[in-house]
Amino acid sequence: MQATAVVETASNKGYNNNGRNIQKDEPSHHKKENLLSPNGCKEAKLTFLNDYYDSLALEKRANDKEISNIDKIDLLEPSFTMSPDTNIESAHSQSSEFEDNIDYAFLNETYTIHYSESKLKSESLIHLNSELDSEMQKREEVFFDILEHQGDKITDLERIYKISYDDYKKTAEDVQKPDIDEDSQQEYHSAEEQECINNHLSFDQAKTLDIPNLEVLGLRNSGCEVKCVSNLEDSHVKLESNSSISLDSVDVYGQEDSPSVSKLQNSVTLRAFHEPKYEKCKEQGTSLMLHTVLDEIILRSSHLEHKESESKGFLNPQKALKTKIYTHKVNPQLTESKDSIGNVIVEDKMLQHLDNPGTLPQDKHLETLLQPCKDCQTSSVFDDSVISASGYSHYESLQSTPNPALDVSITLPRSAIRGNQAVEESGSLKVANGNTISKAHFHNMEGPCPKSETDAAGCTVTVDQTVDVSTDFRACFTASRATSARSSVVSTSSNTEITMMNKKRPSEWQSEKQRSVACNTDWSYIQDTEDPQMAMTKGPTGKSLSVDNLKPNGNVLNKDSLELKTFEFTDLKKHSESMLQIQVEKNLPSKCCQQIMQRAIQAESHLLNVHYQLCHRHCSDIYRLVMEDREGLNRNLSSNSTRKELGSALLSVLGDLKVRYMNLKEKINKGIPLEELPPLSIESRLLSAFSTFASRLMKEESHIFSGADSELDNQSTRDVGSSSLKKTLSQTSLLLDNGHPKQDKSPEEGGLKNGDINVDLSQLKLDDKDCKNYREVSEDWFDAKENLTGADFSGIQENQIEQDKGDPKFTLAEIKNVEPLRKDKGYLMHVGGLCPSVSEADLRSYFQKYEISDISIYDSSPNYRYASLAFKKNSDAKMAVKEMNGIEIKGKSVNVRLVKTPGEYTPLSSKNGNKVSFSNLEKSTSKEMSSPSSVSRLPRTRPRQPGSEQDSEFFPFDQKGVKKNCKQIESTKLLPDTPIQFIPPKTLNLRSFTKIIKRLAELHPEVSRHRDHIIDALQEVRVNHKGFLNGLSINTIVEMTSSVLENSASS
């Protein structure tokens, strides 16, 4: 294996290439270097005087020195040359032993480095002596002094060293451990072992490297070790721009010479290459330990000026960079962490503590140095290389100085290696993704260093090159734009990994991705915020493309030459601001959704409040209507206790309404939609006086009621508490129009097809003059809404219209007395217009030839009395109505009317005996509604005739209250000469009652033929629920009625 280096010297120095030795023109410094080569590894030690370096570092030599010649010297066998005018030129030469394993050492298109040989004198180590000072035999120092490039003048390194392969091999064999086998390269060290190894380490004052331009030195050898001993107290290392350093395996460490000299031992592992033909390396299995002084390097961006050198043919980005090296005290620590992939294990055994950093100026225009700021977070785009390697590590954060030209801060990655392990710290943004570290084990090849007689302190730089025992990893090296350039770490075998064990993983590494080296991934930290130009170098799958497919235009790292060039950085600060804006925009939809949700909640709350106000006003209106009617109030609510009970009932209903309202409002505020909540309703617990009062109002307004009308009227007034009063009055007004058809018809037996007869009303009353106009009307059970049709009142006699005002109404006592008659299934007959002196015995004497089961007399008012007679047979009732209507009892004629009981489906007979079914009823009603004579006449202010015969159903009332509160009743009052067809809503929607009857008939087939039993059960359920079925579901009504039927059947 051959390793060649091209070295460029100043014009005042000359060197001769003599095979394996390099002879200088000065005879006093002509020395031959020995090379250590364990397993094909070479070690080269380069030394420079501190004094000479100081003289180079403290003055500008951009205009004082010129390049006189470029010597090309082989380190081993025949060498190759690289011309500065070409980007990449390589000449391959082979040696007798390593014929197929030639590695190329390329510098960045601008500079070449020549090594001159010098021989070490102690313990198998090659000590390279500088030609300017003989006192360097005690201590070996290497200073890579890359002079600043101004314009077209370039000053390179001033020393050329040649490394002898044979001597290097002998020295390496002395150090080689014979008991190391092939597997010893894959070695894990525990925390205790590393702690014992590293306890003697300490760190001294940091040295500052002021770098005018971004540079990286690149060496490509299979085995090379460079050791340096120096203590840079007043020295700088000036790196020229656009030069690159890429070492396969580098170990630079400082050895402790005296108490004042600090020892810097960190391990940085760079990429190592191995040819498959290295049989000797496979047998010996030597594992080398690499150490480096590079502890913490921070490159600061300065003014950049781009110039091209026509003679050199390279790109000068001219980025003025400032670098500080801080030495720390290291205590070995051991932690272990694995990512989810499980391919990479990183072991870190170092604690770094920044202590007394030293800062030295290099140039006048670069005298301003960034001072360390402890425990300070900066606002720079870069995270200022703040990485904590363990729980006790402490790093100082330096704020990056943005470049005025590019407005970007450039930070060079830091390499800190400790205890045979490698850690690379990136000085870029967050260390986020794509960190590849391979496990490698290296042996420390430290040797005694001769003491120097000079006053200058020394620093030892050792470069070890490790041989890969498995394969040649010549993979693509891509450089991340986020961190400029950094060295890569390659495992010594395809299956080995470096284990970094941190007691506390740095916060920057928490989101990193680690990939295997075999996947051709670099050790760059892929940032969350990627450069737009860098994104172009990635394929569609997000992986880095091979640099073979990219042109070497200065923006990529070539795979063959390993020549790393500088990148042009975009304004990451602006990019981060744009990312913040994007993040804010992403949060906008959630805020909009929250606002929309809030508005929806407010709208539903407002709607609920409106519903609550309607219900509240409904109850208040009912109470006000009752209290305003003085006559009805005095008659029905005679006692103060009854009035108090009325008020307490109203307050109770309003209190329950408010509680339900607050509960619903709270649920809406919690986000429950209003449509998923039960509706806000009122459960009426009003007194019977409400029903009596509302019934009286409706009867007074209609003037004429049939028996069916009166029955439906009582039902609708009972349901006032659960539906609005206006709605009930409107339905009642519609009922009035249906009461008296023109033709004399009577229903057939079983003619009520749909079961739509009203089964829950108190009584049906037939006027003696209106028996021929009788018609049955139905009610919707579930909604307690009367779907009735209009009727013609043209056949009403004038005397009845005049008498309607004075007819009294049923009282609550009458309704209660009728209940036992229902159970007896008797036929009721209404006798109205009785004089006050008529008694029950008088009525029995008049109706004694008819089988009367019961007689009841009611006093609605002092001027109006009526009686209800119950007959056992229908024929007797019909005969009594026919014969007794209009007779005088004690000097006063009475009106006799037949009333069908609620529990009887048997049709009632009229005078002429004609029959009509319910279906015919609807048809005839529709025909009559279309006729002009179907308009009802409802006089508003017709004066009452005190001495006239009055129908027993009516009594006077306050007309103003009706006009004020019953607008829907007035809407049905039309002019006599204006014919109009009135069609009430839901005329044909009578399904609720039919459903109930049908389901009960299916559940109880034994009583399905006798529907009166089902009706009786429904009435009993209604009575048990205080006379209200409104609000109950059909299923609930069916279940309750079914239970009543079962109990009656069992009894």
From Swiss-Prot:
Residues 927-936 have a biased composition (Low complexity). Residues 827-901 form the RRM domain. Its main location: cytoplasm. Keywords: Cytoplasm, Phosphoprotein, RNA-binding. Residues 1-37, 533-552, 731-756, 903-957 are annotated as: Disordered. Gene3D superfamilies: 3.30.70.330. Residues 1-21, 907-923 have a biased composition (Polar residues). It is found in: Cytoplasm. InterPro entries: Nucleotide-bd_a/b_plait_sf, RBD_domain_sf, RRM_dom. GO terms for molecular function: protein homodimerization activity; RNA binding. Residues 739-751 have a biased composition (Basic and acidic residues). The modification Phosphoserine is found at S385, S388, S546, S716, S722. GO terms for biological process: mRNA splicing, via spliceosome. GO terms for cellular component: catalytic step 2 spliceosome; cytoplasm; intercellular bridge. Component of intercellular bridges during meiosis. Intercellular bridges are evolutionarily conserved structures that connect differentiating germ cells. Not required for fertility. Homodimer. Interacts with TEX14. This is RNA-binding protein 44. It comes from Bos taurus (Bovine). The gene is RBM44.
